[in-house]
């Protein structure tokens, strides 16, 4: 999210959905193109200027793309199309069909390969960038590969589900707290925990009366943000001890 991938995928998907009523295949490739394009823009702006500049560039690109989505929605002539786009933006599994999953599978597989290739980089990064560099890791190349992998995964997912936040942040933290293993050994566990959290959220908005009028993305944000803050504070206290 900080590097603009999710915003890029969202903006391109909204454009294709409203103006072209694009089928799922085109939406998936458009989402990936938007995610990759947004990340590459952030990377080109900041790759010589350090992490802080990259985060600030990502925030700026996110704001710009968010404004683009708002502009597209404000120009929507059909109230039905606007309502459907709003529902999609808030997060829903209505469009996550078997056909969509089949279209997305090659892109998701390529993203997984990128992450798996850089598993050693992710393990060493837990000790800091300096330690990773002294162990022979090419930091810029590894970071670029990981970011491309994430962009592929995000771009192939958002056209099917809309923007559903915090699950991708919470699941790895829970996996690491429970298993206490390095990141490279938590890929599958994190994915399963994330899938379970998404399933619980989907069932809650469908069958729990209190959540009946909100969408999945809204529910995950309401519950996920405080929970993530609690996890971060808990980990900080453990490190302080």
Name each model feature, range by range.
Residues 1-241:
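Alpha-helical transmembrane segments in inner-membrane proteins
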């Amino acid at each position: 999210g900080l590097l603009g991938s999710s915003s890029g995928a969202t903006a391109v998907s909204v454009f294709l959905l409203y103006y072209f009523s694009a089928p799922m295949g085109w939406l998936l490739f458009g989402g990936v193109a938007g995610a990759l394009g947004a990340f590459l823009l952030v990377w080109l702006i900041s790759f010589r200027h350090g992490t802080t500049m990259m985060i600030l560039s990502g925030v700026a690109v996110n704001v710009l793309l968010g404004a683009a989505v708002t502009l597209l929605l404000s120009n929507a002539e059909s109230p039905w199309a606007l309502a459907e786009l709003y529902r999609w933006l808030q997060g829903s599994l209505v469009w996550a069909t078997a056909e969509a999953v089949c279209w997305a599978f090659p892109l998701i597989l390529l993203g997984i390969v990128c992450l798996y290739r850089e598993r050693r980089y992710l393990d060493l990064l837990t000790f800091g960038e300096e330690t990773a560099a002294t162990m022979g890791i090419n930091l810029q190349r590894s970071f670029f590969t990981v970011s491309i992998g994430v962009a592929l995964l995000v771009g192939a997912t958002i056209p099917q589900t809309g923007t559903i936040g915090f699950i991708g942040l919470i699941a790895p933290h829970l996996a690491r707290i429970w298993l206490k293993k390095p990141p490279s050994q938590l890929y599958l566990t994190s994915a399963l925990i994330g899938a379970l959290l998404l399933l619980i959220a989907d069932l809650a908005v469908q069958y729990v009366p209190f959540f009946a009028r909100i969408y999945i993305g809204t529910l995950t944000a309401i519950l996920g943000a405080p929970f993530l803050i609690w996890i971060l504070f808990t980990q900080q206290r453990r490190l302080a001890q």
